[in-house]
């Protein structure tokens, strides 16, 4: 089978690999029907993910059909359409029991697929601890509707949840890339008083304006003053930093009112500075960390009910044998791309 593979820093390639086999009784083999490219894949390509293992098949956003299950797998069966969770987690350790599955202490725990073990930009993938990592897709939900459940949408849902958004809040979302838009969609479920999105790209601001017309829009240069003008208490009540650009962390906390929550969703290629002398007196609460992807079943229900729709994010579609072209478009942000669906 063909598999898009991390060869070395700066180089991915589509190569031949054998079809995976069950290794443990808790494994499942999934035939990938649809996948996508994530910015985290680009972080691997450029050497920003030290734990990524050269030689692995990349890709952690995928849906598919269960082809084979180990003897101990529960909850899914052969023939089920499923989402695949970006996080591999045992469900039994201290962190899993408390809902912090990103910190699972099992050998497979955390981000394994497409990072430490073979992922989903291929025809078949072995999913460890499949009882936890697979969720059955409702019959009325299409593959494209479910495509982002296991990662980028789970990230947005997690970010909105831990931000403790209330109906009285003004929410600032920094960044309107794929994760930022998924975060916006999930923040809207909380029905805050207003949402402001800060995004430098005119194309992406236009996308937000078209699909989410009630959202207020600004740019990084104008953001601080814009937030002051549109907030009741001199700053945003909740700030979700989803951009991960050079100065966006600083922008996020500066735009927060005293005693606000700042949730850092983004990944950074370089360390960020926390200027405590400048921040003294703001009494901010910071929340950080990787997605705790334990909400996938609930997210699928919301999609089934028509309360979440991420299909507008899919701007391009490519077959697996053209994945190099798809990566070029995604990495260079060409042709108005937001997300790319890769089909088999």
Predicted regions, residues:
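Local beta-strand N-terminus motif with an aromatic residue
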Residues: 79, 168, 213-214, 235-236, ...
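Residue-level recognition of short, solvent-exposed, well-ordered loop/turn junctions
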Residues: 23-25, 77, 166, 257, ...
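Glycine-rich cofactor phosphate-binding loops and adjacent beta1-alpha1 units
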Residues: 163, 205-285
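Glycine-rich beta-strand-centered segment in the early N-terminal region that forms part
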Residues: 20-35, 48-97, 138-141
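C-terminal hydrophobic helical "lid"/dimerization subdomain
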Residues: 200, 225-226, 250-254, 293-344
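Mid-domain Rossmann-like dinucleotide-binding core that forms the NAD(H)/NADP(H) cofactor-binding site
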Residues: 136-221, 225
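Cysteine-cluster motifs in flexible loop/terminal segments that predominantly coordinate metals
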Residues: 38, 85-135, 139
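Conserved acidic E/D residue at the C-terminus of a beta-strand in Rossmann-like folds
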Residues: 199, 266, 290
């Amino acid at each position: 089978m063909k598999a898009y593979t991390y060869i070395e820093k700066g180089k991915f390639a589509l190569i031949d690999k054998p079809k995976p086999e069950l290794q443990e009784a808790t494994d499942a083999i999934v035939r990938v029907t649809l996948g996508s490219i994530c910015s985290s894949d680009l972080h691997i390509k450029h050497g920003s993910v030290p734990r990524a293992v050269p030689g692995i098949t990349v890709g952690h956003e995928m849906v598919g059909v269960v082809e084979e299950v180990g003897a101990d797998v529960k909850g899914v069966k052969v023939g089920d359409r499923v989402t695949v969770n970006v996080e591999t987690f045992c469900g039994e350790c201290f962190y899993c029991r408390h809902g912090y599955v990103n910190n699972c202490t099992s050998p497979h725990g955390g981000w394994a697929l497409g990072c430490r073990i073979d992922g989903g930009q291929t025809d078949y993938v072995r999913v460890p601890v499949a009882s936890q990592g697979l969720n059955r897709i409702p019959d009325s939900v299409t593959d494209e509707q479910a495509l982002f459940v296991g990662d980028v949408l789970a990230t947005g849902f997690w970010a909105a949840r831990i931000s403790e958004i209330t109906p009285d809040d003004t929410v600032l979302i920094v960044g309107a890339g794929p994760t930022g838009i998924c975060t916006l969609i999930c923040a809207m479920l909380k029905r805050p008083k207003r949402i402001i999105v800060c995004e430098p790209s005119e194309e992406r601001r236009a996308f937000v304006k078209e699909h989410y017309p009630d959202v207020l829009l600004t740019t990084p240069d104008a953001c601080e003053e814009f937030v002051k003008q549109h907030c009741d208490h001199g700053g945003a009540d909740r700030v979700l930093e989803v951009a991960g650009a050079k100065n966006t962390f600083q922008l996020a906390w500066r735009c927060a009112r005293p005693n606000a929550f700042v949730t850092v969703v983004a990944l950074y290629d370089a360390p960020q500075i926390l200027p405590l002398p400048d921040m003294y007196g703001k009494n901010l609460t910071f929340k950080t960390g990787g997605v705790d992807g334990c909400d996938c079943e609930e997210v699928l229900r919301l999609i089934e009910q028509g309360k979440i729709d991420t299909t507008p994010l899919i701007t391009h579609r490519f077959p697996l044998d053209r994945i190099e072209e798809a990566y070029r478009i995604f990495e260079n942000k060409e042709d108005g791309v937001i997300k790319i669906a890769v089909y088999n």
